[in-house]
């Protein structure tokens, strides 16, 4: 098991050598004591930076606009109240954007953030058809906590994280309505260019990856419940500005009625690095494609069957991945380039049902296929 380190929020701070002016002290006092309740997205976006407590009450975000809280005051608490809804327009989004330091983002009892994604769903996701807005950006956020959000029916990807030292706890993303209504590419959490991301107690019902880690380090996903999607994924890695995934632990989670259980995928012909990866105590049921799949052959979003070696996958621990898969599914599939997968440790892998694969290549010692 690899060490997992996050900077404690209590340790974050800076020392100011010069005493603030009287006017600066007055401004700080006003911000620390101000609670602002907004019922308008534009007002919240324009003036919330002056508030230490932001309440977003039954906001209806106009079509084609972002509920933009990227300039939130340091240390602010942001609370969703009632139902947050969004007008319909074909555009890229995001529908919500956060930014800032030492934020606490939460909701009141019974609140829901409802994307009403069925207006966009057409079974094509981001691959064509209607242009669908991304849902929530947690970008340029540092030393912050997001907890207890209830998110429903996102048009496509739900939460995009590009952040440093953030805690996302007890978040529910429920896109189960998309199962029969054309939901596609409705990823739960997409993580990239991040250091220190802790996701605990998430519930994700969707039609794509429960979590997808494309780049970043010191990432933990634990206590998750994932159903309907593509499983617990790293990648695809490659083809971006940052193509390193390091020190990731995914543990104590369940994956049900999904295409895959555990998945690592890298892009053919690209360069990067995937290392220090642990999957521990993952329970599977109703898996339709692969219980465990690790492959170095992705190109244009699909596997090719021909691996490359530019993104090595090293120091991988798979411990206690158990459960059942469907009759036509494959228990384990490993497709590595020559020498580009190494230092793997597997124990307690017990997947029943389905088939074994005869197409694995370059399986490193310590693993089995």
From Swiss-Prot:
It catalyses: (1,4-alpha-D-galacturonosyl)n+m + H2O = (1,4-alpha-D-galacturonosyl)n + (1,4-alpha-D-galacturonosyl)m. InterPro entries: Glyco_hydro_28, Glycosyl_hydrlase_28, PbH1, Pectin_lyas_fold, Pectin_lyase_fold/virulence. Disulfide bonds join 36-51, 210-226, 336-341, 360-369. SUPFAM superfamilies: Pectin lyase-like. Residues 1-18 form the signal peptide. Belongs to the glycosyl hydrolase 28 family. Involved in maceration and soft-rotting of plant tissue. Hydrolyzes the 1,4-alpha glycosidic bonds of de-esterified pectate in the smooth region of the plant cell wall. This is Probable endopolygalacturonase II. It comes from Aspergillus aculeatus. The gene is pgaII.
